[in-house]
C-alpha cells in the first residue's frame, strides 16, 4: 500500500477519533463534575467549587481549545481531499453533517461561559451548586445534541468510505 492511499485512509478516520475524544471529555465532565452535586458534598462544594473550577479550568481547557478546532480542521480536510471517493461512497453528507454538529457545540459557548463565571465567582453566594447544576444540565444537553450526533456521523462516514 503506498503512502498516499494510506494517508487518505488515516485522514478518513481522524474526525471519528477526535470527536471520540471530545465526546469522552464531555462524559468525563458530567461524571466527575457531577460528583459535586451529591447531597453529602454540597455544603463543602459551595465553598470549594469556585477555586477548584478556576484552577481546574486552566488544566483542562486545552482539551477544548485543541479538540474542537482539530475536529473542524479534519472534517474540512476530509471534504476537500479525494472528493470523488466521498461522493461515490455517500460519505460527503456524513462528514458535512458531523462537521456541522461539531460546530454547533459552540452555539452553547455564551451560556456555558456565563455559568462558569457564576461558579468561579461563587454565585449565587452560598449556593454555587445551583450554578454547577445548571452548567451540568447544559453540558449534558449540549453533549447529547451536538457531540454525540457529530461522533455518530463521523463514524458512519468513515465506515462508508473505508
From Swiss-Prot:
Keywords, alphabetical: Glycoprotein, Membrane, Oxidoreductase, Signal, Transmembrane, Transmembrane helix
Entry EC no(s): 1.14.-.-
TM stretches of this protein: 62-82, 99-119, 142-162
Membrane disposition: Multi-pass membrane protein
Domain of life: Eukaryota
CC annotations in GO: membrane
Gene Ontology MF, one: oxidoreductase activity
Location(s), subcellular: Membrane
UniProt key word Magnesium: no
Primary location: membrane
Glycosylation sites: 46, 127, 139
Biological pathway: Mycotoxin biosynthesis
Phenotype seen when the gene is deleted: Abolishes the production of xenoacremones A and B.
Protein family (similarity comment): Belongs to the epoxidase xenD family.
Function (record text): Epoxidase, part of the gene cluster that mediates the biosynthesis of xenoacremones such as xenoacremone A, a compound that shows inhibitory activity toward the PI3K/AKT signaling pathway and which has the ability to induce apoptosis of A549 lung cancer cells. Within the pathway, cooperation of the hybrid PKS-NRPS xenE and the trans-acting enoyl reductase xenG is responsible for the formation of the reduced tyrosine-nonaketide derivative. The alpha/beta hydrolase xenA then accelerates intramolecular nucleophilic attack to give a pyrrolidone derivative.
Name of the protein: Epoxidase xenD
High-level lineage: Eukaryota, Fungi, Dikarya, Ascomycota, Pezizomycotina
Amino acid at each position: 500500500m503506498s503512502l498516499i492511499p494510506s494517508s487518505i485512509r488515516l485522514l478518513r478516520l481522524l474526525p471519528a477519533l477526535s470527536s471520540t475524544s471530545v465526546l469522552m471529555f464531555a462524559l468525563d465532565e458530567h461524571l466527575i463534575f457531577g460528583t459535586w452535586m451529591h447531597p453529602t458534598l454540597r455544603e463543602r462544594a459551595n465553598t470549594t467549587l469556585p477555586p477548584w473550577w478556576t484552577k481546574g479550568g486552566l488544566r483542562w481547557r486545552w482539551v477544548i481549545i485543541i479538540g474542537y478546532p482539530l475536529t473542524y480542521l479534519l472534517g474540512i480536510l476530509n471534504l476537500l481531499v479525494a472528493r470523488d471517493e466521498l461522493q461515490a461512497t455517500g460519505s460527503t453528507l456524513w462528514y458535512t453533517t458531523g462537521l456541522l454538529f461539531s460546530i454547533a457545540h459552540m452555539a452553547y459557548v455564551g451560556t456555558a461561559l456565563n455559568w462558569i463565571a457564576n461558579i468561579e465567582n461563587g454565585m449565587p453566594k452560598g449556593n454555587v451548586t445551583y450554578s454547577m447544576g445548571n452548567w451540568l444540565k447544559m453540558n449534558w444537553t449540549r453533549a447529547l445534541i451536538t457531540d454525540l450526533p457529530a461522533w455518530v456521523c463521523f463514524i458512519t462516514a468513515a465506515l462508508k468510505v473505508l
